[in-house]
Amino acid sequence: MKFATFAFTLCVVISLSVLVLADEEEKDFLMNLIQPLKESEERQFCGTNGKPCVNGQCCGALRCVVTYHYADGVCLKMNP
């Protein structure tokens, strides 16, 4: 029983150390692995056509456009 507690504590300490030493991009990646995701859209790093922008980003050739309904922007295909 003591070994299991020690092993768990060691695992937690190592995980926290990695988070402290990691740069911002790695922290975001690790936090996404650690935290359970509530919605499938949160798993994406960019917005898809007709969906809200994710951190101001849209997938592919889509553009983040601020509209009346979406103050933070919605991803739309823009004609060249």
UniProtKB/Swiss-Prot annotation:
UniProt-recorded name of the protein: U10-hexatoxin-Mg1a
Stated role: Inhibits Kv11.1/KCNH2/ERG1, Kv1.1/KCNA1, Kv1.2/KCNA2 voltage-gated potassium channels and Nav1.7/SCN9A voltage-gated sodium channels. In vivo, no toxicity is observed upon intracranial injection into mice and intrathorax injection into crickets.
Tissue expr: Expressed by the venom gland.
PTM sites of type Pyrrolidone carboxylic acid: 44
UniProt comment concerning the protein's domains: The presence of a 'disulfide through disulfide knot' structurally defines this protein as a knottin.
Residue ranges annotated as propeptide in the record: 23-43
Entry GO terms, CC: extracellular region
Signal peptide: 1-22
Cysteines paired by S-S bonds: 46-59, 53-64, 58-75
Positions of transmembrane segments: none
